[in-house]
């Protein structure tokens, strides 16, 4: 399955300490990594590089430019009316893995 991960796409982190939190893709680093931000003041996700296998894209997208600052991302999320959606935490789908298989 090919994931549609482009700039401005809202994603859910499925692995790591921020699992279940939503973030926005700010830049595509290469075929395996993207740069995401919550921003931290909105969702608790700091700007960081993550493996695309650790995120799951949603059907939501905000209009931002490549490398947008946290302030620009917040304005775009507010303009799209997604503030409450971004603050919601979800139970991440573990992509078919059992808890014992996740290390």
UniProtKB/Swiss-Prot annotation:
Q: Which InterPro entries match?
A: Rib_uL2_dom2, Ribosomal_eL14, Ribosomal_eL14_arc, Ribosomal_eL14_KOW, Translation_prot_SH3-like_sf
Q: Which GO terms describe its biological process?
A: ribosomal large subunit biogenesis; translation
Tell me the domain of life: Archaea
* Gene3D superfamilies linked to this entry: 2.30.30.30
Q: Enumerate the SUPFAM superfamilies for this protein.
A: Translation proteins SH3-like domain
Mind telling me which CDD domains this protein's record contains? KOW_RPL14
What the entry lists under NCBIfam families is as follows: PRK04333.1 (NF003320)
Q: What is this protein's record name?
A: Large ribosomal subunit protein eL14
Lineage of this protein's species? Answer: Archaea, Thermoproteota, Thermoprotei, Thermoproteales, Thermoproteaceae
């Amino acid at each position: 399955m090919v994931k549609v991960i482009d700039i401005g796409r809202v994603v859910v982190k499925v692995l790591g300490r921020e699992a279940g939190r939503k973030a926005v893709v700010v830049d595509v680093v290469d075929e395996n990594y993207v740069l995401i931000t919550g921003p931290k003041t909105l969702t608790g996700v700091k700007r960081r590089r993550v493996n695309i296998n650790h995120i799951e894209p949603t059907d939501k997208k905000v209009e931002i430019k490549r490398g947008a600052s946290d302030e620009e991302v917040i304005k775009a999320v507010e303009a799209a009316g997604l503030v409450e959606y971004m603050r919601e935490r979800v139970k991440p789908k573990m992509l078919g893995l059992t808890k014992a298989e996740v290390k």
